[in-house]
A protein has these predicted regions:
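N-terminal beta1-alpha1-beta2 module of alpha/beta enzyme domains
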Residues: 1-93, 190-191, 374, 390-418
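Internal, glycine-rich beta/alpha segment that forms the wall or movable "lid"
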Residues: 2-17, 33, 104-212, 224-227, ...
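Conserved, mostly hydrophobic/aromatic
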Residues: 20, 54, 58, 66, ...
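Hydrophobic faces of well-ordered beta-strands that scaffold small-molecule active sites
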Residues: 20-24, 62-64, 93-96, 123-127, ...
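Active-site mouth loops of central-metabolism enzymes
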Residues: 29-45, 97-106, 188-199, 290-300
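Glycine-rich, proline-tolerant flexible connector loops at the mouths of alpha/beta enzymes
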Residues: 61-84, 99, 131, 218-221, ...
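Alpha-helix-loop-beta-strand connector modules within alpha/beta enzyme cores
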Residues: 71-97, 149-153, 338-349
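Aromatic-lined glycan-binding groove of carbohydrate-active enzymes
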Residues: 202-208, 226-234, 241-279
Length: 418
């Protein structure tokens, strides 16, 4: 295997610690207890309220998915996150999935760099292929090429962020000659990237190759399935020279529904579980909670369940919870966030910090990653030359020269798809 790029992760201690938050798949589902189906406008307003409340109760991260079909509303995550970013101060804004297969890498590079600037660096993203098959032809792609698309598009995205002037030719989009994506990443440091996977080992391999994070969705499958993916990612992260397996950057999804009394939680959530399409009308709620991380009960039960996650997966950096799905009304979701932020997360922070080895990196933040590149020195402030975008006959497009871009290898670089 050829040389891999330098790591995208920060291993500086004391900058990010462990992050807790929520993610939304943006479903619009009928409330089975009232028969009310929210309008798109209602759900969009509600998701902003939910994200703002997440910050108010002390959570670190809000993430939203990307879908281009009903019954989902989140077709433009960057628009939503920019609006939320303008109304929050500390909340890290992320995606549950950014579709690397059907979005143009040029647009991803520019949109998320812009979001970085608007939020002062409070942004990262989870790359994924999505789980809606028809989205491929809707955007002119072939689902049978899903994995090669993901590999080629991400290699181009990294090049667009790492290099001011890009010459590129691949299989799935037109060539680029002397192209510069704008704006350049904030402080000369691109957004941190997680690679999300439910079942694909090649995505874990890709995350490891680049030294990026690996986010295991962890909501619909047994722990043994994700243990295999995470173990593979950790081993390959070390293989590519980014650190030890324990220094790999891992995020987990999860689900919870709580009440002070556990039986009250079971009674209240059962109609939502039994009727929500997301659960597929398959196993009983009891069987599903046994097989997956879904925890329906008291806050202490949620604490106990998630404090044990590192026993299964090792020390990790980010824990997100799915809280606003299955038709739950806004009032209930906000009450769930009160319990999550007020009773669960403070205890989990302490429990998961206990006996955490010093070499285990904290969760990545923009500030930590900037410090890893520049130390205490000045950061890059990209100032264009007067060439008007002519990168072919005039020198570089900017007054300064960025550091040399990481060298792509043959496994997941552009050469892999030619």
């Amino acid at each position: 295997m050829s040389e891999s790029p330098v790591t995208n992760a920060s291993t500086l201690p004391g900058e990010g610690q462990m992050q807790f938050g929520i993610f939304s798949v943006s479903d619009i589902t009928t409330d089975p207890t009232t028969g009310h189906t929210p309008s798109e406008a209602e759900r969009i307003r509600d998701i902003v309220t939910i994200a703002k409340h997440a910050e108010e109760v002390g959570l670190d991260v809000f993430a939203i998915g990307e879908h281009h079909n009903a019954p989902f509303f989140s077709s433009s995550p960057t628009t939503t996150l920019a609006y939320i970013g303008a109304q929050t101060e500390k909340l890290i804004l992320s995606t549950a999935t950014t579709l690397i297969t059907t979005n143009d890498p040029v647009k991803i590079a520019e949109d998320y760099s812009m979001l970085q600037h608007l939020t002062n660096g409070r942004v990262d993203l989870v790359m994924g292929r999505g789980n809606t098959g028809p989205v491929y032809p809707w955007f002119g792609q072939d689902i049978r090429q899903g994995l090669p698309l993901a590999i080629e598009n991400y290699a181009l995205l990294r090049q667009l962020w790492d290099e001011d002037v890009v010459d590129w030719e691949g299989k799935f989009r037109g060539p680029l000659q002397g192209f510069t994506s704008t704006p350049r990443p904030l402080d000369g440091v691109s957004p941190f990237v997680w690679h999300g996977s439910i079942r694909t080992p090649e995505i874990a391999e890709q995350a490891a190759y680049y030294g990026d994070g690996f986010f295991a969705n962890n909501i619909f499958w047994p722990k043994e399935h994700y243990q295999r993916l995470i173990q593979l990612y950790r081993q390959r992260f070390a293989h590519y020279g980014h650190g030890t397996p324990e220094q790999a950057i891992v995020g987990l999804g999860g689900q919870a529904f709580m009440a002070k009394n556990s039986q009250d939680a079971v009674t209240a959530f059962r109609p939502y579980f039994d009727n929500a399409p997301v659960y597929g009308h398959g196993p009983s709620m009891e069987d599903f909670t046994e097989m997956t991380p879904l925890t329906v009960g008291s806050p202490q039960q949620v604490i106990d369940r998630y404090a044990a996650m590192r026993d299964h997966y090792g020390d990790y950096q980010r824990q997100l919870f799915l809280m606003d799905h299955a038709g739950l009304p806004l009032k209930t979701v906000l009450e769930q966030l009160d319990l999550l932020g007020g009773e669960v997360v403070p205890v989990l922070r302490k429990e998961l910090a206990k006996n955490r080895p010093a070499e285990v990196p904290d969760a990545p933040t923009h500030a930590a990653r900037v410090k890893a590149v520049y130390g205490d020195g000045p950061t890059r402030q990209a100032r264009p030359n007067a060439a008007g975008g002519n990168n072919l006959t005039v020198g570089g497009p900017y007054q300064d020269t960025p550091a040399a871009a990481p060298k792509a290898g043959s496994a997941f670089g552009a050469a892999a798809t030619r």
